[in-house]
Amino acid sequence: MQISDRLSSSTAPILNLPVRRASVKRKTGETDVTVNLNLDGVGNCQANTGIPFLDHMLHQISSHGLIDLDVQAVGDIEIDDHHTNEDVGITLGQALKQALGDRKGIVRFGHFLAPLDEALVEVALDFSGRPHLSYGLEMPTQRVGNYDTQLVREFFVALANNSLMTLHIRQLGGINSHHIIEAGFKAFARSLRMATEIDPRRVGEIPSSKGVL
């Protein structure tokens, strides 16, 4: 079932622009991942990765980024969550890259500071075409439920590399691992929303002084 069947229609026509959607499938000997997304959505989400905590975080990206997102994944989680977690990041990154196309008219940069109780996380990103991750989350526990907290970094490495995004994630406070991670995903979502929005003063233009991204 396609995202158009499961998720809401776009709000993009406000500027009479094409709907920015993508559908990407990645199948390996370890995982089978499909991502459908609509950048101009309303935050509807279907996430079934076999990793409940990752599903919860994907819902944060969708809800706070106002992206309609459908992620379906089957992987070798009987061995470890690593392959599925990473491949979801890879596929989501590829879908973002596909949906953005030539990146004409986008704001390009995004920045947000998100609190969650005692946790405070700052994210800044740039759809620069130069993939990079600077990661500064320090969780006090190795696991949140059954989820290995090391996998948060692996997810964002995969996403940044495959979306060609420069991404900085910095923790300013926090003592609860769940709160720290969720604040990070919420800050990422709001930064993503900001960066991918269309700037009405630059419609049809590459947001770079070089004229290329």
Curated annotation (Swiss-Prot):
Main subcellular location: cytoplasm
Group of enzyme by EC: lyase
Gene Ontology molecular function: any one: imidazoleglycerol-phosphate dehydratase activity
Pathway in which this enzyme or protein is active: Amino-acid biosynthesis; L-histidine biosynthesis; L-histidine from 5-phospho-alpha-D-ribose 1-diphosphate: step 6/9
Domain of life: Bacteria
GO terms, biological process: L-histidine biosynthetic process
Keyword Lyase: yes
Endpoints of the signal sequence: none
Entry annotated with the keyword Lyase: yes
EC number: 4.2.1.19
CDD domains: IGPD
Catalysed conversion reaction: D-erythro-1-(imidazol-4-yl)glycerol 3-phosphate = 3-(imidazol-4-yl)-2-oxopropyl phosphate + H2O
InterPro entries: IGPD_sf, ImidazoleglycerolP_deHydtase, ImidazoleglycerP_deHydtase_CS, Ribosomal_Su5_D2-typ_SF
GO cellular component terms listed in the entry, alphabetical order: cytoplasm
Pfam families per record: IGPD (PF00475)
Keyword set, alphabetical order: Amino-acid biosynthesis, Cytoplasm, Histidine biosynthesis, Lyase
Family membership noted in the UniProt record: Belongs to the imidazoleglycerol-phosphate dehydratase family.
Protein name: Imidazoleglycerol-phosphate dehydratase
